[in-house]
Amino acid sequence: MALIVVVLFLGGMFTQEYQRGTLVLVLTKGFPRRKVYTVKTMIALLMWTICFWISFGITWFYNSYYWDNGIVSHILPAAALFWLFGIWVLLLVVFFSALFSETSGVLAGTGAILVLSYVAAIFPKVQDFLPVKLLGVQELLLESTAVGDYGQAVLVTVLMSAAAAIAGMLLFEKKRI
């Protein structure tokens, strides 16, 4: 739920500036496009990281106070997997923000990639390689799987995140504003 709110909140981080013309002012003063893209991306990732871990900490302490957290194992790796999934989704948002000039295009592009990932996860041969596997941490929490079982999905997610970040930067450098 929180990730959906973050995507909706950050979906217009570039597109609103395209429409208002505020990026033109910054770029005509000589500020490099690469730095604008990098700073906006880093702020989005930092915001996700801080909000996620604060939320995790509050939930963890709340559950510890009222219930026993001893039944759950591998809680930090499970949280880190969901955090990494959020990083991937945010980098998709940034990529589509560099590609499209409308917030609806950004949200549609990000949603389409997520839906394709969910649909592809139906096929057993590829499901271990997809970023959506990182959302299946319930099995990890109940010790039905090991942390190492998520290694392929983590590697693919990191590579796809890096590709989205680099491609977004290249698109933003060439985009007419």
Q: How would you describe each model-predicted region?
A:
Residues 13-45:
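Helix-loop-helix units of permease transmembrane domains in multi-pass membrane transporters
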Residues 17, 61-69, 99-103, 119, ...:
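Membrane-interface elements of multi-pass transporters and channels
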Residues 1-13, 37-105, 110, 140-159:
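Secretory targeting signals
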Residues 1-23, 121-122, 163, 173-174:
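Transmembrane helix-boundary elements of multi-pass transport/secretion proteins
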Residues 111-177:
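Terminal transmembrane helical anchor/hairpin motif
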Residues 22, 35, 106-107, 166:
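Hydrophobic positions within alpha-helical membrane elements
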